[in-house]
Amino acid sequence: MEQGKGLAVLILAIILLQGTLAQSIKGNHLVKVYDYQEDGSVLLTCDAEAKNITWFKDGKMIGFLTEDKKKWNLGSNAKDPRGMYQCKGSQNKSKPLQVYYRMCQNCIELNAATISGFLFAEIVSIFVLAVGVYFIAGQDGVRQSRASDKQTLLPNDQLYQPLKDREDDQYSHLQGNQLRRN
């Protein structure tokens, strides 16, 4: 069993090292994303050393900027900007940067206060429901009259009337002359 654990650790270490090596290979990452703007807009910045910068989205040219304006505004992050963006200077073209925003408009941030609020509301609602069921079920809906306590009860032999013997009825005898066939 120890050999299996050792093999699993070795495989995991190899996979993690491959990911680290793949990330450390530096490419031509000239495009950077800045999405912490006060107005909620998403900006792309090109670090190319050129006077004129051309922006591409999904392989198609979308804009042309001068050197002093290296930032491309994608608009509000609530509009879910997405696509493969590249910038090109006079000498080189950046690697593509995939931008994909998925903003949740009606989401709730789950933190300790929110979860405790949900739990408190759930406990209170269960308590209110239990108290309501207790009071509704505890009420006597039909009250018996006191006259039933004063009735004279019949003796056991008078409760039931004996059956009369009849020869003409189908079920008048328990045993029949004919056997039932399937």
Curated annotation (Swiss-Prot):
GO annotation, cellular component aspect: alpha-beta T cell receptor complex; clathrin-coated endocytic vesicle membrane; cytosol; external side of plasma membrane; gamma-delta T cell receptor complex; plasma membrane
UniProt-reported outcome of changing L153A: Abolishes lysosomal targeting
UniProt GO molecular function: identical protein binding; signaling receptor complex adaptor activity; T cell receptor binding; transmembrane signaling receptor activity
Pfam families: Ig_4, ITAM
Extracellular face of the membrane: 23-116
Main subcellular location of this protein, as a coarse class: membrane
Residues modified as Phosphoserine: S145, S148
Signal sequence, start to end: 1-22
Compartment(s) of residence: Cell membrane
Transmembrane segments: 117-137
Keyword entries, A-Z: Adaptive immunity, Cell membrane, Disulfide bond, Glycoprotein, Immunity, Immunoglobulin domain, Membrane, Phosphoprotein, Receptor, Signal, Transmembrane, Transmembrane helix
Post-translational modifications: Phosphorylated on Tyr residues after T-cell receptor triggering by LCK in association with CD4/CD8. Phosphorylated also by PKC; leading to the TCR complex down-regulation. Phosphorylated on Tyr residues after T-cell receptor triggering by LCK in association with CD4/CD8.
Domain Ig-like, residue spans: 37-94
UniProt KW Cell membrane keyword: yes
Cytoplasmic side: 138-182
Assembly description: The TCR-CD3 complex is composed of a CD3D/CD3E and a CD3G/CD3E heterodimers that preferentially associate with TCRalpha and TCRbeta, respectively, to form TCRalpha/CD3E/CD3G and TCRbeta/CD3G/CD3E trimers. In turn, the hexamer interacts with CD3Z homodimer to form the TCR-CD3 complex. Alternatively, TCRalpha and TCRbeta can be replaced by TCRgamma and TCRdelta.
Domain text: A di-leucine motif and a tyrosine-based motif are individually sufficient to induce both endocytosis and delivery to lysosomes.
Function description: Part of the TCR-CD3 complex present on T-lymphocyte cell surface that plays an essential role in adaptive immune response. When antigen presenting cells (APCs) activate T-cell receptor (TCR), TCR-mediated signals are transmitted across the cell membrane by the CD3 chains CD3D, CD3E, CD3G and CD3Z. All CD3 chains contain immunoreceptor tyrosine-based activation motifs (ITAMs) in their cytoplasmic domain. Upon TCR engagement, these motifs become phosphorylated by Src family protein tyrosine kinases LCK and FYN, resulting in the activation of downstream signaling pathways.
UniProt-recorded name of the protein: T-cell surface glycoprotein CD3 gamma chain
Organism: Homo sapiens (Human)
